[in-house]
Design a protein with these regions (language model features):
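Gly/Pro- and small hydrophobic-enriched strand-loop and loop-to-helix capping segments
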Residues: 230-246
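Conserved alpha/beta-domain cores
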Residues: 2, 9-220, 226-228, 240-242
Length: 246
């Protein structure tokens, strides 16, 4: 395959780049990407799965458009963002990148649904019939996933598993929304294996409702997620480093 030409992006000020610890000196983005892909490959082999069936979603929240452009030049095409207004500021610089797709993976308030539908190709965090109807009203074809809350943490968003039949029915009544699967965010733990029961439960819920897409797993626990059936892993820190001031 011929090399991908570098993305053409507006200049970014030195102060903007210096503010974020974008690419720690220990490794380049290319090296980090190779390491993440190797982890995905190894986990898929252990699970006797085809790694081509696993999407690497590069989570670029809080990083400038310049970073998206560099990741794109290295072959990444799927990007995740958590904040509508933040991505609205970056979108003019990146929405014209051929083949790039942008996923919303944060909590989406219904009053921002119209703007989110305009900016993103996939909304992974639909958690209520009301939000589904707001996205439908935007009149744009969208891929959607349903966020499921599988823990008792009050800070976590998502639909209760018992509410899934009603939510699935509501989404399927929306002609502009294409339902592709389920998404979850387990409670944080230093032990990657602590997330496995949550991943397994999401897979079982997807199977019960005839859905194939599973967005689960992040930088520290992607192996467990893949072994439990993830079709999309959301990776930020392992690619771009910690999101912190320099």
């Amino acid at each position: 395959m011929p090399p991908v030409a570098p993305a053409v992006l507006p200049p970014v000020s030195v102060s903007a780049v210096a503010y974020w610890n974008v690419l720690p000196a220990a490794k380049t983005l290319a090296e980090r990407l190779a390491a993440v892909r190797a982890r995905i490959q190894a986990a898929a082999e252990r699970a006797r799965r085809d790694p081509a069936g696993i999407t690497l979603l590069a989570v670029t929240k809080v990083f400038p458009a310049l970073v998206i452009g560099e990741a794109y030049a290295l072959g990444l095409r799927e990007f995740g963002e958590n904040y509508v207004q933040e991505f609205a500021a970056k979108a003019p610089a990146v929405r014209n990148l051929a083949g790039a797709r942008f996923h919303f993976i944060g909590h989406l308030q219904s009053n921002k649904a119209a703007l989110a539908a305009e900016l993103f190709d996939c909304i992974q965090t639909v958690d209520s019939p009301k939000l589904a109807r707001r996205l439908e009203a935007a009149g744009r074809q969208l891929e959607v996933m349903l966020e499921v809350k599988l823990s008792a943490e009050s800070a976590k968003s998502g639909a209760d598993p018992a509410a899934l039949p009603e939510l699935i029915a509501a989404v399927r009544e929306c002609p502009h929304l294409a339902l592709s699967g389920l998404m979850t965010m387990p409670p944080w733990s230093d032990d990657p294996e602590a997330a496995r029961p949550h991943f397994r439960r999401l897979r079982e819920l997807a199977q019960r409702h005839g859905l194939s897409g599973l967005s689960m797993g992040m930088s520290h626990d992607l192996e467990a997620a893949i072994e439990e059936g993830a079709t999309c892993v959301r990776v930020g820190t392992a690619l771009f480093g910690a999101r912190r001031k320099a």
